[in-house]
Amino acid sequence: MKKLFATIVSLLTAAMLLAPATSMAQTKSRLAQILERGTLRVGTTGDFNPMSLRDTTNNTLVGFDIDAMKQLATDMGVKIEFVPTEWATLVNGLVSDRYDIFSGASLSMARAKTVAFSSPYTYVGTVPVTLKKDGAKFTDWASLNNANTTVAVSMGTVFEQQARALFPNAKVRAVEKPATGFQEVLAGRATATITSNIEASTLVKTYNTLQMIGTSATMKEARPLAYPVPQGDYVWLTFVNNWISLKQAEGFFDSLEAKWLTAK
């Protein structure tokens, strides 16, 4: 597989060398720039647990996307530089050439107007969370939809809307901040809460009495996560897409999901 990846790099590099000299003079592909520079610049926020977060014990970045970007740099044979950014300036950082790729974001049409997105590498969606001791009673979405269950969610969120639509036979309790749905479950005032699979994976690792029901295959309102890159550079976008395809075939992203996103 590594030989195949090296072959792709060689072919893309050869294609760039064979391009018309005038075109190359005007526009050098980002892939060529990165290989020439010897450093892959990755924008990241460090506040998207467990995808990109800062380990306060040693002040280093860790997470699903951090591991993925480190592997991308390794496979390219270059060093990695993480460039701090904010969600509000994610797009601007790519447009202004502060970094070559962003460490993963949900694909949206609004963002896609300004930046390009790679192929999806995983999906984020809504999942239920209950007490682990109730695991035998609640095994799927349907098992929660009855008059004897109470689903707690934060008031005014998308999860409140989803809970009312998904559980018409259950009691839906919307709680105001600073209360949260999962705290209501921990306190025994609610049977379940619903949240993103990203947050759920963190909750079940933090609170060993909680469990996430189902898997990525059974979550609701699924939307893809992909790597944003600058628009217009199809050599770089194709390279990233090829890398994702190869890593998916190798099981690399499955291993990251097991490490960071799967409830244990």
What are the language-model segments listed below?
Residues 25-29, 158-172, 212-215, 242-264:
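Ligand-binding clefts/hinges and TM-proximal coupling segments of bilobed small-molecule sensing domains
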Residues 52-58, 69-78, 140-141, 145, ...:
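Ligand-binding cleft/hinge of the Venus flytrap
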Residues 66, 81-92, 138, 173-187:
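Short helix-initiation/N-cap motifs at beta->coil->alpha
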Residues 123-127, 201-245, 261-264:
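Periplasmic-binding protein-like
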